[in-house]
Amino acid sequence: MAASRWARKAVVLLCASDLLLLLLLLPPPGSCAAEGSPGTPDESTPPPRKKKKDIRDYNDADMARLLEQWEKDDDIEEGDLPEHKRPSAPVDFSKIDPSKPESILKMTKKGKTLMMFVTVSGSPTEKETEEITSLWQGSLFNANYDVQRFIVGSDRAIFMLRDGSYAWEIKDFLVGQDRCADVTLEGQVYPGKGGGSKEKNKTKQDKGKKKKEGDLKSRSSKEENRAGNKREDL
């Protein structure tokens, strides 16, 4: 009996000590309300840092944003800027000839990309157009003109210039070639040396039509005269 009493007292003391330890560990009442509701971050607590994305997982949009950030942070030379961000070259009006409107266009297109369309005469195939325009591009390259060429049809190509102020000089070279039918530049069509065959064929066709019309008229007048003579005889 005495042993069981001592065992009961030991269990009660052990439970009391555990309860006291639990009360000491618990926060005082009202502290939770002062700190805020659970799950709401404290204003003084800085937000967790966003984990950086691995560069190996970058997509095109991430690379574009990174490049844009570099452009903002670094001083980029004017020549390396995109064309739409480059400042326009100042126009010296003292060098403009009022009698030549093309001189104004040359000044305004300086340093800007410009394209012109070139048509090859003689109804060529796309391969022939490639060969002919390649020769023209080579001649321009030897004359220190930076020109890029793109075939856009069986008889048509685009010549693209980095500096549009030289476009009219290149146009003058192209229209002087034997197989150049025409050059389209800034909405203006310039006939080439090779475009004359079309005009000749057109004039020949017009002459043939006029000759046929004249023959028909002469035949009809002769028939009318014959009919008139027959009536007089009757």
Curated annotation (Swiss-Prot):
GO CC annotation: endoplasmic reticulum; plasma membrane
Matches recorded under InterPro entries: MESD (IPR019330)
Q: Where in the cell is it found?
A: Endoplasmic reticulum
Sugar-bearing residue positions: N201
User: What's a single GO BP term from this record?
Assistant: protein folding
Keyword terms: Chaperone, Disease variant, Endoplasmic reticulum, Glycoprotein, Osteogenesis imperfecta, Signal, Wnt signaling pathway
Q: Where is this motif: Prevents secretion from ER?
A: 231-234
Q: Where is the composition biased (Basic and acidic residues)?
A: 54-70, 196-234
Signal peptide from the UniProt entry:
1-33
Cite the residue spans of the region called Chaperone domain: 1-164
- State the residue spans of region: Disordered: 31-95, 187-234
Q: Where is the composition biased (Acidic residues)?
A: 71-80
The record's region (Escort domain) falls at 165-204
Asked if the Swiss-Prot or TrEMBL record annotates the protein with the keyword Glycoprotein, the reply is yes
Q: Which Gene3D superfamilies match?
A: 3.30.70.260, 6.10.250.640
Q: Name one Pfam family in it.
A: Mesd
Q: Where is it mainly found?
A: endoplasmic reticulum
Which molecular function term from Gene Ontology is one that the record holds?
low-density lipoprotein particle receptor binding
Assembly and binders: Monomer. Interacts with LRP5; the interaction prevents LRP5 from forming aggregates and chaperones LRP6 to the plasma membrane. Interacts with LRP6; the interaction prevents LRP6 from forming aggregates and chaperones LRP6 to the plasma membrane. Interacts with LRP4; the interaction promotes glycosylation of LRP4 and its cell-surface expression.
- What disease involvement is noted? Osteogenesis imperfecta 20: An autosomal recessive form of osteogenesis imperfecta, a disorder of bone formation characterized by low bone mass, bone fragility and susceptibility to fractures after minimal trauma. Disease severity ranges from very mild forms without fractures to intrauterine fractures and perinatal lethality. Extraskeletal manifestations, which affect a variable number of patients, are dentinogenesis imperfecta, hearing loss, and blue sclerae. OI20 is a progressive deforming form characterized by osteopenia, skeletal deformity, healed fractures, and newly-acquired fractures.
What does this protein do, in the record's words? Chaperone specifically assisting the folding of beta-propeller/EGF modules within the family of low-density lipoprotein receptors (LDLRs). Acts as a modulator of the Wnt pathway through chaperoning the coreceptors of the canonical Wnt pathway, LRP5 and LRP6, to the plasma membrane. Essential for specification of embryonic polarity and mesoderm induction. Plays an essential role in neuromuscular junction (NMJ) formation by promoting cell-surface expression of LRP4. May regulate phagocytosis of apoptotic retinal pigment epithelium (RPE) cells.
The text of the family note is: Belongs to the MESD family.
User: What domain comment accompanies this record?
Assistant: The chaperone domain provides a folding template for proper folding of the beta-propeller (BP) domains of LRP5/6.
Task: List the protein's name.
Answer: LRP chaperone MESD
**Lineage start:** Eukaryota, Metazoa, Chordata, Craniata, Vertebrata
